[in-house]
Amino acid sequence: RYDSIRDSVFRAHPWNCLIRRQDLAQSSTNPTFGYAHQYPLPTDPYCLRVLEFSNGSMSYPQDNMKNNSGGPAFVIEGRNIVTDEGTAKIKYVARITDPNEYDSGLIEALSMRLAAEMAYAITGSTSMVQITTSAYDQSLKEARFVDSTEGATRRIEASDFIEARY
């Protein structure tokens, strides 16, 4: 049960300590229809959630990439990315099993989620479940905020919409 709870907390936010980048190797089998290429998702470390997809010159979601027919630039099917792009690079949330690599906020959130999951079995109290679930929600909120504000801030480019306000 620990593994599924851990993975759920990992997928809840793009934690900086869990983000990895990788060039994907094209599969020897192509999709039957719809897209030209297929790329297996990374297994070492295991990919839990794709955050960005790039063909080397454009990225999704930043450049709002589309395929030649105007559809999505890529689709995740099972443990594969299918796309028309001949090159595939991704930024993803990885399953990191060494807790020494976790941010302190992530550790706190994961601990609170585990406490919420075990509360009834240990205490037999539904109010304790509510208390620990609320504590998890609060710790997750705080950890996400701190994690998302670390590092360089993204510059918002001026557009006609933004310029119209001034």
Predicted regions and their residues:
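Glycine-enriched, solvent-exposed interface loops adjoining structured elements
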Residues: R1-Y166
